[in-house]
Regions:
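Intrinsically disordered, low-complexity, mixed-charge
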Residues: 1-175, 179-182
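Internal gly/pro-rich beta-alpha loop/helix module
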Residues: 62, 162, 316, 320-395, ...
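A phosphate-binding glycine/aspartate-rich beta-alpha loop in the early core of alpha/beta enzymes
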Residues: 76, 218-281
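A contiguous, well-structured pocket-lining segment that forms one wall/lid of small-molecule binding clefts
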Residues: 160, 175, 182-184, 406-444, ...
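Short glycine-rich phosphate-binding loop at a beta-alpha junction
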Residues: 212, 450-462, 703-714
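Conserved phosphate-binding catalytic cores of ATP/NTP-utilizing and phosphoryl-transfer enzymes
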Residues: 256-261, 310, 336-343, 367-368, ...
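Conserved phosphate-binding/catalytic loops in two-lobed NTP-binding clefts
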Residues: 459, 474-486, 707-711, 718, ...
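Glycine-rich phosphate-binding/hydrolytic loop that grips phosphoryl groups
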Residues: 483-505, 509-511, 550-559, 686, ...
Length: 759
């Protein structure tokens, strides 16, 4: 007879871990206890050496599906004899905290939901140890019902019996509930509740109405994705003329009908996180054009909450569409609504009916958006199902840091030692409501993770709201340059701490020289960077308008490339009028609302304008995306199909310059010659990749650094990503890219937290 104390660290709370341990131990004839300690699960296992060994083997090799084991330690324990194996009350201990994300409804709960003989028949909140809300309802750790919003709903006797019975799937399931216990769904401003409310919602959808639906992490706005007039009306109400809308399809069969996808995408669609996955549309699909206009892809997710399943499958005699638009329930720029008060104040004007429920949401959680690249996940927005799973590094860092993140697509990051907890998506910080949401989320996550940051890190921009927030925290503050933070985020995700050649391409960021950066090649390590190369600067004229109207950038670059004949060329190609050219030239010369820029994002906008694809954008990245889609229509091998340009790079004051004026000039010549726009779009991508790779090779030869890191929102363009990566690898360089941390500003906070301040 031996007794061992076993501690298991990782995602072991909220995933049915203690019931799993109890069942395994009992089956092996072991006695003892298992308890949550907040930062780990502690097991006392008493029995034969063989049985204890088999339990440890089960913990290591076949833990519950949703668990993530990071470390197991064990030691001999002197304990009196135990009579049985029990789950005992949780106790708080100091240490690393691992919080489970929200988990999509499992297959067993799906079956029970529609089983008329089951007491949870049609219960919109059915869950078990393998599924249900976690992060969004959690008030503090350890994860027990009394520390969640489910404390508002005392268990009925039947639920309590299952909760305490090791033989059931709901043994120790903290959010366990049923139709007796609550919560319940209802239509705001109506007497309709429960099944009646769901039927009324379905009827409204089929009548072409727009509905607000409260889910796990906040509200969605939804309508029939096959109803063109309903989708157009939703766009008008949200002032969202062209940005793609996500759709929720009833099941994988509906997804196959609408889209082409492979095994990797199917695993993402059907996995327990249930993100929105970007898929190629089929021409034979039935989704209306307004869902994702002029876009070959559409964001698709499958139902992940029981309420979603009821909307599609509740057999109440109402014929229901199998395709719903599901877009975030928020005012443009504001955070997603999470309460009835939010919904009534902010989105009631966008919808005809609000289907809500009385389970409180403590932490907002938007849907995660996922793409794929080279057979692996390539995340665009990291939120529900993934946050706040920590990014682990082997650096052995000490202390705690709060990183505030970027101004756009904001997330924040809490570092505890070598664990980096990247938050759910917060939003764009221009709106004061989003700043308030950031403040609330930081406070709650610090409490949840028992974090007491010793310092704070933020961006360098003097006018960002995130910077003002960081400066008001009364903590030692360090400001990290935006594009350097991008590269650091890629290094952190890949657990790489040595020097890299970082290619950081995005739309904007405040440079150390006070100009706009965005097309940077940096020599980086964790302690600092050197600007080795960049896009050749151009004038960005018109303030905020210049980030939306690519013709302005095209005019400036073409004018620089052609000199005195620039105005004539621009007018001939329809880039701008003679009057507009003269006005912009004067503004640039006198530096009126004009600033020097090296933005790769604006370069893409300029190329799109020159080719007559998009002169302006109604949402971030619209013109650049249209350029990418045009290029992807031209299917050729990326190497050796164009006559090389005379000069791809130059040097000025020790900095390599990518000759983008020559690149825009090439596009202008192509348009004058009547060449195919798709071919020219592809050539733009190819030549920019050539320039980038050539610059990296030169830097590598000079410094001996053989590793490159690619980050920044422009690398969401998978065509450019593939071209640059392939060229660098052909040169013998190792390339680090993102996977489960966004390349865009949603990953900035991780990079800020990874910065090693040696002061």
């Amino acid at each position: 007879m031996k007794t061992e104390m076993i501690r298991v660290y990782g995602i072991v709370q909220g995933v049915g871990f203690r019931p799993f341990v109890s069942r395994e131990a009992s089956d092996l004839g072991l006695c003892g206890t298992v308890a949550n300690k907040g930062s780990y699960v502690e097991i006392h296992a008493q029995g034969s050496e063989k049985a204890v060994g088999e339990l440890k083997n089960a913990l290591e090799n076949r833990p519950p599906e949703r668990a993530m084991i990071m470390e197991i330690i064990s030691a001999h324990a002197d304990e009196p004899p135990f009579d049985s194996f029990e789950i005992i009350d949780s106790e708080k201990e100091k240490g690393d905290i691992f919080v489970s994300p929200d988990i999509a409804v499992c297959e067993k709960c799906k079956v029970e939901l529609f089983d008329k003989t089951n007491r949870r028949y049609l219960h919109p909140f059915i869950n078990c140890t393998q599924c249900g809300p976690r992060l969004t309802i959690m008030d503090s750790m350890p994860y027990d019902r009394v520390r969640t919003t489910m404390a508002d709903f005392p268990m009925c006797k039947d639920c309590e019996r299952e909760y305490t019975d090791p033989a059931t799937r709901r043994y120790d399931a903290q959010p366990v509930c049923c139709n007796k216990c609550g919560p319940e769904v209802y239509i705001i401003g109506s007497e309709k509740k429960g099944a009646e409310a769901i039927t009324a919602t379905k009827e409204a959808v089929m009548a072409g109405k727009i509905i607000a639906v409260k889910g796990i992490g906040g509200f969605h706005l939804c309508c029939d994705a096959k109803n063109e007039s309903a989708v157009k009306r939703l766009r008008e109400l949200k002032n969202r003329p062209a940005k793609p809308l996500a759709v929720m399809l009833k099941d994988i069969s509906a997804a196959r009908r609408e889209c082409d996808f492979g095994e990797v995408q199917e695993k993402l669609l059907t996995g327990w996180q249930k993100p929105i996955v970007l898929l190629d549309k089929k021409t034979s699909g039935s989704l209306c054009k307004s869902v994702a206009p002029d876009n070959p892809t559409v964001g698709v997710m499958l139902p992940y909450a029981p309420l979603h399943l009821l909307l599609f499958d509740y057999d109440d005699g109402v014929e229901m569409t199998d395709s719903l638009v599901m877009t975030s329930g928020n005012v443009r720029g504001a955070p997603i609504c999470r309460s009835d008060e939010d919904a009534l104040c902010e989105i009631a004007g966008f919808c005809d009916l609000i289907l809500s429920h009385n389970r409180r949401i403590l932490i907002r959680s938007d849907d995660t958006v996922m793409d794929t690249f080279e057979g692996k996940p390539y995340i665009i927005r990291r939120s529900r199902g993934y946050a706040p799973l920590p990014i682990m590094t082997s650096c052995g860092d000490k202390g705690q840091t709060l990183a505030i993140g970027g101004e756009l697509k904001n997330t924040f990051c809490i570092r505890k030692g070598s664990l980096y907890y990247l938050s759910s998506y917060v939003g764009d910080m221009a709106d004061i409501r989003t700043v308030k949401a950031l403040e609330e989320s930081v406070k709650r996550m610090c409490e949840l993770l028992e974090a007491t940051p010793q310092n704070v890190v933020c961006d360098m921009h003097p006018k960002y709201n995130t910077v003002a927030f960081a400066e008001g925290l009364d903590l030692p503050l360090k400001k990290v340059q935006h594009h350097y933070a991008h590269i650091l985020s890629c290094m952190a995700e890949n657990d790489y701490s040595e020097k890299v050649i970082g290619v950081s391409y995005d739309g904007t960021g405040f440079g150390t020289d006070g100009t706009i950066w965005g097309g940077e090649i940096l020599l980086c390590d964790r302690t600092g960077f050197e600007r080795m190369g960049s896009i050749k600067p151009f004038m960005q004229v018109g303030g905020d308008l210049s980030s939306k109207e690519g013709w302005r950038i095209a005019t400036m670059i073409a004018g620089s490339a052609y000199g005195e004949s620039g105005g004539e060329i621009c007018e001939k190609l329809g880039i701008c009028t003679a009057k507009e050219y003269k006005l912009l030239s004067i503004m640039a010369e006198k530096k009126v609302n004009a600033v020097s820029s090296t933005s790769a994002g604006r370069l893409f906008d300029a190329a799109s304008a020159v080719l007559g694809i998009r002169r302006f954008s109604t949402f971030e990245g619209e013109a650049s995306m249209a350029l990418q889609f045009a290029a992807e229509k031209f299917s050729r091998e990326p190497f050796g199909i164009y006559e090389p340009m005379e000069k791809l790079t130059a040097e000025k004051e020790g900095r390599i310059m990518l000759c983008t004026q020559a690149l825009i000039k090439r596009l202008c010549q192509g348009m004058q010659n009547g060449e195919d726009k798709n071919r020219l779009s592809y050539e733009f991508h190819s030549l920019l990749a050539d320039m980038t790779a050539q610059a990296c090779r030169t830097i590598s030869e000079r410094t001996g650094v053989k590793v490159c890191a690619l980050s920044g929102g422009v690398f969401q363009n998978k065509l450019l990503l593939k071209m640059v990566k392939c060229r660098l690898e052909k040169m013998g360089l190792r390339v680090l890219i993102h996977s489960l941390v966004p390349a865009n500003d949603g990953g900035i906070a991780l990079g800020q937290a990874f910065y090693l301040n040696e002061e």
